[in-house]
Regions:
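Amphipathic alpha-helical coiled-coil/heptad-repeat segments
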Residues: 1-3, 140-200, 362, 382-436
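Accessory (non-catalytic) regions of SAM-dependent nucleic-acid methyltransferases
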Residues: 1-3, 11, 169-170, 181-243, ...
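Short, well-ordered loop/turn sites that connect or cap secondary structure elements
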Residues: 50, 56, 306-308
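Low-complexity, Lys/Gly-biased intrinsically disordered segments
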Residues: 2-44, 49-52, 65, 70, ...
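Short, ligand-facing micro-motifs at secondary-structure edges
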Residues: 22-42, 61-64, 68-86, 101-105, ...
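Non-catalytic DNA-recognition/assembly elements of restriction-modification systems
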Residues: 1-20, 135, 139, 143-147, ...
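A short glycine-rich beta-alpha junction/loop motif
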Residues: 2, 66, 82-89, 121-144, ...
C-alpha cells in the first residue's frame, strides 16, 4: 500500500529556535501554554514560571517532551504567540510530507517506543528533547497512504474512544461519590438514624460534644505561649450542625500544628528517612526519593517536628490540602509538610474531616502565592472542624470506612476497564504501524 521510505523526523519537522529567561521583556506580554493534555488540548494561562521559556507561534506543532508518547502533541490554534517551558518543543512542519494526524497516532504507537529503544542510547528517557527526537529514523509512507491509514485507525478507534469517555465519566462519578460521603459524614447526615437511638447526654463525652471538647482541653499538651485562637462567629459557619455537635478550630483539638524544619538538612547516604511533598502527594507515604538525614540531626529536632503514630501529615505547598496518616516508623519532613498532632481519641474522625470538601474549601480560601500556593500554618490552625460526640465519631468512622471500601472496589474495576481499553488502543496502533 503506497511507497514507504526511511526518513529522519527532522526532514519534515524543524525546531523553532529561541530560548528566553522568564523575565525577558521580549516575552513579557505573552500568555503561557500551561499544559498540553493527553488528548492534545492546549491549556493557556497567565501563570508565571521560573523556568527558561520558548515561544510557540500560531500553527506550530507543540510536543511535550515528557508525555509525547501519551498523546501530548498538538497544533497550536491560537491567534497570538504564547510561551512554554523548555519541557516543551515547538516545530514548523512540512504538510506536503506529513499528515499530522498520522504523526500523532505514530508517536502514541508501540512502533514509536520501539524506535526509541533501538535508536536512542540508553533506551527511553523521561524526557525527549529535540536533539534526540529529530534525528530518529522512521518508515514513512507517501501522503495518500498516510491519509488512508488515518482513516482506518479513526474507524477502529471510534468504539474505543466511546468506551474511554465512559471510563472518564465513571472516574468523575467515583471521585464525586468520595466527596459526597465525606461531606455527608461531617454534616451528620450519615448518622441521622443513629442519633435517634442515641440522644444527647449532657456532660457525657460519648454523647455530648461540649463535654468532649472539655475533655480534649484537659488532655491537650499545649504551648501556653501560643496565642488563643479567635472564636467562631455564626457568619463563618458553612452549615448548621446536629444537636449535640460543636464547631471548633483545628488548633483547639490538637496538641500542636507545625511544619518541618525550615533549614534544609544535610543529606546522608543512609539514616533517618527525610520525606518530601512528592512522597505523600498520593495520600500515602512512599519513600520514592530515598533521602536521609543523620540520627544526630533527627535527635535535635523539637518533638512537635517529629511525626509520630496517630499524627496527620498535611501538604501545605504546591499540591496542598492532602492529609496523610502516620504509621509506626521514624522519619522527618520538609517544611512544605504540616505536622498535625491531634488529641489521640479523635484522630480517626479528624483525618476524614481534613479529607472533606469543607476543609478543602477552607484550604483554597487561605492558600496564597502566584506560581506555587502555600497554606500558612497559622491559617491551618484556624480551620473550622465539626466536632461530634465521641461515640458518634466512632460510628461515622465505621460508616466512612465501609463506604470508601466500596468506592475503592469500584475504582479498581474502572482501572481494569481502563487498562483493557489501553490494550485495545495499543493493538489498533500496533497493527497500523507494524514493521514493513
Amino acid at each position: 500500500m503506497g511507497e514507504w521510505k526511511k526518513v529522519r523526523i527532522g526532514e519534515f519537522l524543524t525546531e523553532r529556535q529561541g530560548r528566553y529567561k522568564p523575565d525577558d521583556n521580549a516575552i513579557a506580554t505573552y500568555k503561557r501554554l500551561d499544559k498540553l493534555d493527553f488528548s492534545g488540548t492546549a491549556h493557556i494561562s497567565e501563570k508565571p514560571s521560573k523556568t527558561d521559556m520558548i515561544v510557540v507561534q500560531p500553527g506550530d506543532l507543540v510536543i511535550s517532551g515528557i508525555n509525547v508518547a501519551k498523546g501530548a502533541i498538538a497544533v497550536y490554534q491560537g491567534m497570538e504567540p504564547v510561551t512554554a517551558t523548555i519541557h516543551y518543543s515547538s516545530y514548523i512542519f512540512d504538510d506536503s510530507a506529513i499528515d499530522l494526524n498520522y504523526f500523532k497516532y505514530f508517536v502514541k504507537s508501540p512502533a514509536f517506543i520501539e524506535t526509541l529503544k533501538k535508536q536512542v542510547k540508553g533506551g527511553i528517557k523521561t524526557e525527549i528533547k529535540p536533539k534526540v527526537f529529530l534525528p530518529l529514523e522512521i518508515l514513512l509512507p507517501d501522503l495518500p497512504t498516510q491519509k488512508q491509514i488515518v482513516k482506518k485507525i479513526s474507524v477502529n478507534l471510534k468504539r474505543v474512544n466511546k468506551l474511554a469517555k465512559e471510563i472518564e465519566t465513571q472516574k468523575r462519578y467515583a471521585k464525586q461519590l468520595r466527596r459526597n460521603i465525606l461531606q455527608d459524614a461531617i454534616e451528620g447526615k450519615l448518622t441521622a438514624d443513629w442519633r435517634k437511638e442515641h440522644p444527647v447526654q449532657k456532660g457525657n463525652p460519648d454523647y455530648d460534644a461540649e463535654a468532649l471538647f472539655e475533655l480534649i482541653q484537659k488532655e491537650r499538651k499545649v504551648d501556653k505561649k501560643r496565642k488563643t485562637l479567635p472564636p467562631i462567629l455564626d457568619a463563618e459557619k458553612p452549615f448548621e450542625l446536629p444537636t449535640g455537635w460543636k464547631w471548633v478550630r483545628l488548633g483547639e483539638i490538637c496538641n500542636s500544628i507545625t511544619d518541618g524544619d525550615h533549614l534544609p538538612p544535610p543529606k546522608q547516604p543512609s539514616g533517618i528517612p527525610f520525606v518530601v511533598i512528592s512522597d505523600i502527594s498520593s495520600g500515602k507515604i512512599h519513600f520514592r526519593n530515598k533521602r536521609f538525614v543523620s540520627r544526630d540531626y533527627f535527635n535535635k529536632l523539637p518533638r512537635e517536628k517529629i511525626p509520630e503514630t496517630g499524627d496527620i501529615l498535611y501538604t501545605v505547598t504546591g499540591s496542598y490540602g492532602i492529609p496523610v496518616p502516620v504509621n509506626d516508623f521514624q522519619f522527618c519532613v520538609q517544611r512544605h509538610i504540616g505536622i498535625i498532632k491531634p488529641v489521640h481519641l479523635i484522630k480517626d474522625f479528624l483525618f476524614f474531616s481534613l479529607m472533606s470538601p469543607i476543609c478543602k474549601k477552607q484550604a483554597d480560601g487561605v492558600a496564597w502565592g502566584v506560581a506555587v500556593k502555600t497554606i500558612p500554618i497559622k491559617e491551618l490552625r484556624n480551620f473550622m472542624i465539626p466536632l461530634p460526640p465521641l461515640a458518634e465519631q466512632k460510628e461515622i468512622v465505621r460508616l466512612i470506612e465501609n463506604m470508601l471500601l466500596k468506592v475503592e472496589q469500584l475504582e479498581q474495576q474502572i482501572l481494569r476497564r481502563e487498562e483493557y481499553i489501553n490494550q485495545l488502543m495499543k493493538g489498533i496502533l500496533k497493527g497500523a504501524f507494524k514493521e514493513r
